[in-house]
Amino acid sequence: MQKRIHEVNIGANVPKKWPNWLHRFGCFMLDRRGWRVSGNFINEDKAILAVAPHTSNWDFFIGLMVVFSFRLNINFFGKHTIFFPPLGYIIRRLGGIPIRRTKAHGVVNNIVEQIKSSQHLLLALAPEGTRSPIFPWKTGFMHIAREASVPVQLIGLDYDTKTIVLGPIIQKVDNIEEQMQTIYAFYANVSAKYSAKCITNSK
């Protein structure tokens, strides 16, 4: 069942911020563009939000409007090279955290420690790790969730139906290879902005 953005209930455990005017602005922009929401948002203060398919810069704009609409206090990672002033200040205010991607294993460990040491942290990640076509997807987000002992919610940006799909929740990450098949199956039914860039099988 599709609902208007402002009709979605956000649980008491979900960390929130943003003033009323940004909440109204986010709702207005999504309504104006015809976007709706389907499903329920995870009621946790720590979680990985796997947002896909990520094939366009528009994905960030849609995601940001959702964050404003729900008043979500979330974090996301970006290349350290974009965190220069004054842009870096704005990105940090929006929840951005700079990372260097030269050492993937070190990045995972660093994120895990940040989650463990934080009182609350909703971390939005693109499971593909790139806007370019790729298969298999990168599994760093699953390793982070497993090592930090936090759940993963799958969130789809369906451009065909203009729906933000709040999908299934993986409460415990254990068998990553098997659980990735569940993830591929979910996103196979979500239409990307550029469908040719979203690959959910090896064919």
What are these regions (language model features)?
Residues 2-7, 118, 195-196:
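Intrinsically disordered, low-complexity regions
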Residues 24, 194-197:
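Long hydrophobic alpha-helical segments that form multi-pass transmembrane helix bundles
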Residues 10-15, 32, 36-189, 198-203:
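Soluble catalytic domains of membrane acyltransferases
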